[in-house]
From Swiss-Prot:
GO BP of this protein: canonical Wnt signaling pathway; cell fate commitment; neuron differentiation
Keyword Disulfide bond found: yes
Post-translational modification: Palmitoleoylation is required for efficient binding to frizzled receptors. Depalmitoleoylation leads to Wnt signaling pathway inhibition.
Signal peptide from the UniProt entry: none
Subcellular location: Secreted, Extracellular space, Extracellular matrix
UniProt-recorded name of the protein: Protein Wnt-10
Pfam families: wnt (PF00110)
Predominant cellular place of this UniProt entry's protein: secreted
S-S pairs: C79-C94
Phylogenetic lineage: Eukaryota, Metazoa, Chordata, Craniata, Vertebrata
Cellular component GO terms held in the UniProt record: extracellular space
Length: 113
């Protein structure tokens, strides 16, 4: 009949937070697959799923000083007691424990009422 139709399709990226949450879940469940030097193949019986992240070398802990990678470590650094993330004491102190220092100061403030 001589008429034509126009169809437009597009894809929208998912919410940024959901992408981050998915990546974190995949990172936390990533599978370590050591390579066998003699055969050049993957060792063991672990077979990753198609959607699973894998890694072949363990990451440094960054807790101890490692000069070859330029990491000063975390020993002696101040941590944030109330933080839950990387700057928090449980993460930053790497299980070595930490000291809590409480101070009470009495100072003259020269306040006038």
């Amino acid at each position: 009949s001589g008429s034509c139709q126009l169809k437009t399709c597009w894809q929208v990226s998912p919410d940024f937070r959901s992408v981050g949450d998915t990546l974190r879940e995949k990172f936390q469940s990533a599978l370590f697959l050591p390579l066998h030097n003699g055969h050049g193949g993957i060792g063991g019986l672990l077979v990753p799923r198609d959607t699973q992240l894998v890694y072949f070398e363990r990451s440094p802990t960054f807790c101890e000083q490692e000069d070859d990678i330029g990491s000063p470590g975390t020993r002696g650094r101040l941590c944030e007691r109330t933080e839950q993330g990387f700057s928090g004491c449980s993460s930053m102190c790497c299980g070595r424990g930490h000291n809590v220092v409480r101070e009470t100061r009495v100072e003259r403030c020269n306040c006038k009422f």
